[in-house]
Design a protein with these regions (language model features):
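Periplasmic-binding protein-like
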Residues: 132, 146-149, 175-184, 205-209, 214-216, 286-308, ...
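Extracytoplasmic ligand-binding site segments that recognize negatively charged/polar headgroups
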Residues: 49-64, 75-93, 97-230
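Immediate post-signal peptide segment of exported/extracytoplasmic ligand-binding proteins
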Residues: 15-49, 67-68, 171-176
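Extracellular/periplasmic bilobal clamshell ligand-binding domains
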Residues: 310-347
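A ligand-binding cleft/hinge motif common to bilobed small-molecule-binding domains
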Residues: 109-112, 232-251
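A bilobed periplasmic-binding-protein/Venus flytrap-type ligand-binding module shared by bacterial periplasmic
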Residues: 152-157, 193-195, 263-275, 294-295
């Protein structure tokens, strides 16, 4: 049966109860009854649809591991990030063709999705193993993984002693036309604006924009271009990507500038999930020790207590999560507008 036909026939998509309301009732059962009921209902649903900003390879690895645990649930996946994911979800809501069951995207990008009414709270039993800073009180967001943001540099083009040591160093004329940056680093922008203050922050950003940055789609692309020598410095690299490339012998090293921050990538329940019981099992498993251990195998940092990190050096210098007030939809909208006007005025 096609996904579209499945949605049209799915009572969860059009019933009065949202996915969160349904699962909240199930959560009142004893752990044993809850487990058995979820498994029974999920088996009848037969599938779950996962929207994620992870790489295709990582999504496939995660899906395969989940299938090993729950072979009766097929995992449908959609890989995207940023504004494209938001636009897709908005279009589906308007058309009343809600495909997503579980959504994984950065916290700041999750804000407009929540504002659309596309998310529901879900208090997974696994949430108790996550520190308070890595989940919201209402149950909408739980950290799936954390992405420390680092500055990278091509070691063939930049000597260690010459690499920028702070954000002011990026304004040095010698780096003009030599720097790459992701074109949607809204959390990075928000953290620095809060760190500098509004007036100083805007002055800094305008001066940085005058350095003729090469704006690229996505941090992975920034890292690849940096390794290829198409730039000397990458301002916004994912920490795990930088360390993986360095581990493989690429001419790349990294610096943790101050403020050093980590972007939380959340995992969330879609409000109108067509397969709510399978969604609950997928969420529970993804946040479990087993699921989180697989996520660390990708080099990503996780917040769950007791899970061994692949790259612990990324957390040796204390990082802070993107402040939750930066994730407020109204604040995020202002930050996005400011960033675009400064760095991408022609788009």
């Amino acid at each position: 049966m096609s996904l579209a036909l499945g949605l049209l026939q799915s009572p969860a998509a059009f019933s009065q109860d949202t996915a969160g309301q349904l699962l909240a009732r199930i959560n009142k059962l004893t752990p044993e009854k809850r487990r058995d009921l979820l498994a029974e209902k999920a088996k009848a649903e037969g599938e779950v649809t996962f929207y994620s900003s992870m790489s295709v390879t990582q999504i496939e690895t995660l899906s395969k591991a989940f299938n090993n645990r729950y072979p009766f649930i097929k995992v449908n996946t959609y890989r995207s990030s940023g504004e494209r994911a938001i636009a897709k979800i908005q279009t589906e809501l308007q058309a009343k063709r809600n495909a997503a069951d579980v959504i994984n995207i950065s916290a700041a990008q999750a804000a407009p999705i929540k504002a659309l009414g596309a998310l529901d709270p879900y208090n997974s039993p696994q949430r108790e193993f996550f520190p308070a800073d890595y989940k919201d009180k209402e149950g909408y967001f739980t950290s799936f993984y954390i992405t420390p943001i680092v500055l990278g540099y091509n070691t063939n083009l930049v000597k260690r002693g010459d690499a920028p040591k702070n954000y002011e160093d990026l304004l040095n004329p010698k780096w003009k036309g030599e720097m790459l940056m992701d074109d949607e680093p809204y959390e990075w922008y928000g953290v620095l604006m809060k760190h500098f203050g509004k007036e100083r922050g805007l002055q800094y950003m305008k001066r940085l924009a005058q350095q003729n940055l090469s704006m690229q789609r996505g941090r992975t692309n920034v890292a690849q271009m940096l390794v290829a020598g198409e730039g000397a410095i990458g301002i916004t690299l994912s920490g795990h990507s930088a360390l993986e490339l360095k581990e493989k012998g690429a001419p790349l090293d990294w610096v943790a500038l101050d403020p050093y921050f980590a972007q939380a990538n959340m995992i969330m329940l879609a409000r109108y999930a067509p397969h709510p019981h399978a969604a609950a099992l997928f969420l529970d498993w993804s946040l479990s020790e087993e699921g989180q251990t697989i996520v660390t195998s990708f080099g990503r940092v996780v917040a769950r207590n007791g899970v061994k990190q692949r790259f612990p050096e990324l957390m040796q210098k204390k990082s802070r999560l993107v402040d939750m007030d930066l994730i407020d939809p109204k604040v995020e909208k202002v930050l996005t507008k400011e960033f675009r006007e400064i760095f991408i005025p022609t788009r």
